[in-house]
UniProtKB/Swiss-Prot annotation:
Top-rank taxon, per record: Bacteria
EC number assigned by the record: 4.3.2.10
Enzyme's top EC category: lyase
Stated role: IGPS catalyzes the conversion of PRFAR and glutamine to IGP, AICAR and glutamate. The HisF subunit catalyzes the cyclization activity that produces IGP and AICAR from PRFAR using the ammonia provided by the HisH subunit.
Lineage of producing organism: Bacteria, Bacillati, Actinomycetota, Actinomycetes, Mycobacteriales
Catalytic reactions on record: 5-[(5-phospho-1-deoxy-D-ribulos-1-ylimino)methylamino]-1-(5-phospho-beta-D-ribosyl)imidazole-4-carboxamide + L-glutamine = D-erythro-1-(imidazol-4-yl)glycerol 3-phosphate + 5-amino-1-(5-phospho-beta-D-ribosyl)imidazole-4-carboxamide + L-glutamate + H(+)
InterPro entries attached to this UniProt entry: Aldolase_TIM, His_biosynth, HisF, IGPS_HisA/HisF, RibuloseP-bd_barrel
The entry's keywords: Amino-acid biosynthesis, Cytoplasm, Histidine biosynthesis, Lyase
One cellular-component annotation, GO: cytoplasm
Gene Ontology terms: biological process: L-histidine biosynthetic process
Protein name: Imidazole glycerol phosphate synthase subunit HisF
Species, as recorded: Mycobacterium ulcerans (strain Agy99)
Length: 261
């Protein structure tokens, strides 16, 4: 059974990085180069972000080498925890990212094909370093239902796996991951709020921290996610396009009685 530890709710901006550049658009007026992940990470750090997540969306091996450089430079300038994910397939991948300066590594598709990978990673590096990223959606009408009604997806939510999302999160926790990054593919990009029902279901199934992702659109969306069981809230475009600041999100959560840093 999960019990709230009373820790501060973490606010986490997420940056998608392709060949060393931030993609999906960023609109920071005070930056010389809003496509530079190191500069953007430093700006979020200064603004009060509790952690940062980098998602490597590069497919090429040259892009992977570039990502390690980005992580190194970021770790030199930013002193909040950094999670890096995207294309992590092996224990060696985790080792390289941690050595480059990542504090945590998130694993997604590779673990679906080989769940024991999570146990191997947690054993070698410690549970606190390993995050299971779950891209989940409601099972489409006409597809075979899963027990919870949500399924794990791959390929940016386009391909269903038939694996129950809540059961998969619980299995990841049993295998030793230290955290679940729960991304609603239904809510992602809608700015209509987080999938609270899915958050509640996963929260009831695991004892490790859960990060809510997908759907943030205004300051009023964050406190309900915490009430539904999120230990941290992650967002991208609302921060990148300056629709919301870290401070505004924290103030809104604090006004609802949540502890923030």
């Amino acid at each position: 059974m999960y019990t709230d530890t009373g820790l501060a709710v973490r606010v986490i901006p997420c940056l998608d990085i392709d060949a060393g550049r931030v993609v999906k658009g960023v609109n920071f007026e005070n930056l010389r180069d809003a496509g530079d992940p190191v500069e953007l990470a430093a700006a979020y750090d200064a603004e009060g972000a509790d952690e940062l997540t980098f998602l490597d969306v590069t497919a090429s091996s040259s892009g992977r080498a570039t990502m390690l450089e980005v992580v190194r430079h970021t770790a030199e300038q930013v002193f909040i925890p950094l999670t890096v994910g995207g294309g992590v397939r092996t224990v060696a991948d985790v080792d390289l990212l941690l050595r480059a300066g990542a504090d945590k590594v998130s694993v997604n598709t590779a673990a679906i094909a080989r769940p024991d990978l999570l146990a191997d990673m947690a054993t070698q590096f410690g549970s606190q370093c390993i995050v299971l990223s779950v891209d989940a959606r409601k099972v489409p009408v006409g597809s075979s239902p899963t027990p919870s009604g949500w399924e794990v997806t791959t390929h940016g939510g386009r391909r269903g796996t038939g694996i129950d999302a809540v059961e998969w999160a619980a299995r990841g926790a049993d295998l030793g991951v230290g955290e679940i990054l729960l991304n609603s593919m239904d809510a992602d990009g809608t700015k209509a709020g987080f999938d609270l029902a899915m958050l509640r279901a996963v929260r009831a199934a695991v004892t490790v921290p859960v990060i809510a992702s997908g759907g943030a659109g205004n300051v009023d969306h964050f406190a309900p996610a915490v009430a539904a069981g999120a230990d941290a809230v992650l967002a991208a475009s609302v921060f990148h396009f300056r629709e919301l600041t870290i401070g505004q999100v924290k103030a809104a959560m604090a006004a609802e009685g949540n502890t923030v840093r």
